[in-house]
Amino acid sequence: MSEVDKILYKLGYYDSDPHKKTEVQGYIDEAVEFMLDCGVKREKLTSQRAYAIKSIWADARDKGEVDDVIKKDGMVVALISQLRR
């Protein structure tokens, strides 16, 4: 099962259409770009913490809660700071 399929499953899309898969893959790509811009090394993008960030990001984007993803004391910021070490 691919990473995007696992995230789709967690979001509740068990047998999703190709459009939703492409949409969620775009969210994952956004999360990866954000992590790279924050200084996360490319080799850490396949870690469990990076996967958690991608899942949180995709979930928030899917719900339309874009502004709530990145907060000073939020989970995404905490995970990224751990990945930067």
PLM segments and residue spans:
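Protruding loop/beta-arch "assembly-hinge" segments enriched in small, turn-prone residues
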Residues: 64-85
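Conserved short "hinge" loops at termini or chain/domain junctions
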Residues: 1-52, 81-85
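Short, hydrophobic/amphipathic alpha-helical patches that form generic packing surfaces
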Residues: 52-63
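Amphipathic alpha-helical interaction segments
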Residues: 35-38, 42, 61-69
